[in-house]
């Protein structure tokens, strides 16, 4: 994790980048053999050739399918290029997900130049899903998407997510189950991040956002909505109407700061009462 774009895997000074960024942040003890395998894989990735010898393509495509769907730009696809674990096994790279508390388009609300338009965010293009960075600066996604077979597989995973989970009604069933499961705990939680009423409103809004996002992605796959930012900027008439969506209901940076302070106070009160 870093507030700077340190983990984008795109660097001109490759050797220094490997030593100072990758290995210094390793979560496990590494051997020289481990280092050589990782370096070889990153070098192959940088060439854009023979990607299957360096990347676990199927796993990484699945990772990006979810990242793109949930509109998580506090991640590799955002301007910071962070919040993931780079995992290497047998010379193949994978990306492990981490830190989703600003997913569902809430991260852009807190940027220095906030992006708050729900129509833009929910229709965000699946083929150029990066925010305030370039495709070239995110080589894992870029190099895979340049391969026709990988792009096709990525689209198929997005379609599978839409058909198997959203258009089938499974998502709404699961959403109600999860909401009911935590409802009483949220209502009674003395350290809650928000009021119970705010929680209920956010649950309803999250369901609406996910259903609209799924519909937009399906229309992009069918070419009814443009799937790149350049095309969308040229023709916004095709975008899904999101005028009844308020993403800020889900919370943003300021809400987290205020809620964190409230939570600390409530937690201290609970601890004192238990003495």
Show which residues each predicted segment covers.
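Surface-exposed charge patches in extracellular/virion surface proteins
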Residues: 4, 11, 160, 194, ...
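Short, solvent-exposed loop/turn segments at the edges of secondary structure
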Residues: 5, 79-81, 136
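Active-site acidic catalytic loop and adjacent metal/ATP-binding pocket
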Residues: 52-106, 210
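Intrinsic disorder/low-complexity detector
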Residues: 3, 10, 17, 21, ...
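Short, hydrophobic/aromatic alpha-helical segments in well-folded domains
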Residues: 41, 47, 65, 82, ...
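Long, His/Glu/Asp-enriched segments that create or flank divalent metal/ion-associated functional microenvironments
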Residues: 140-141, 211-274
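C-terminal catalytic region of ATP-dependent kinase domains
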Residues: 26-29, 87-232
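Internal "kinase-insert"/substrate-recognition segments embedded within catalytic cores
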Residues: 1-70
């Amino acid at each position: 994790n870093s507030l700077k774009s340190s983990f984008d895997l795109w660097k001109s000074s490759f050797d220094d980048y490997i030593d100072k960024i990758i290995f210094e942040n390793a979560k496990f003890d590494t051997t020289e053999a481990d280092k050589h395998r990782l370096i070889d894989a990153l070098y192959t990735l940088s060439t854009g050739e023979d990607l299957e010898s360096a990347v676990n393509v199927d796993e990484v495509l699945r990772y990006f399918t979810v990242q793109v769907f949930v509109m998580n730009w506090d991640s590799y696809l955002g301007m910071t290029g962070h919040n993931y674990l780079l995992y290497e096994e047998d010379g193949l790279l994978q990306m492990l997900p981490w830190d989703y508390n600003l997913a569902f388009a809430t991260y852009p609300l807190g940027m220095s130049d906030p992006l708050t338009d729900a129509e833009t965010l929910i229709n965000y293009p699946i083929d150029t899903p990066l925010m305030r960075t370039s495709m070239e600066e995110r080589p894992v996604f870029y190099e895979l998407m340049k391969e026709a077979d990988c792009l096709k597989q990525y689209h198929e995973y997005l379609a599978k997510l839409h058909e198997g989970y959203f258009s089938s009604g499974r998502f709404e069933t699961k959403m109600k189950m999860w909401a009911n499961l935590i409802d009483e705990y949220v209502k009674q939680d003395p350290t809650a991040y928000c009021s119970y009423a705010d929680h209920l409103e956010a649950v309803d809004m999250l369901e609406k956002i996910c259903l609209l996002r799924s519909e937009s992605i399906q229309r992009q796959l069918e070419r009814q909505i443009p799937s790149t930012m350049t095309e969308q900027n040229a023709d916004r008439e095709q975008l899904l109407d999101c005028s009844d969506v308020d993403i800020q209901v889900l919370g943003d940076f300021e809400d987290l700061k205020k809620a964190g302070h409230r939570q600390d106070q409530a937690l201290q009160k609970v601890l004192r009462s238990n003495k």
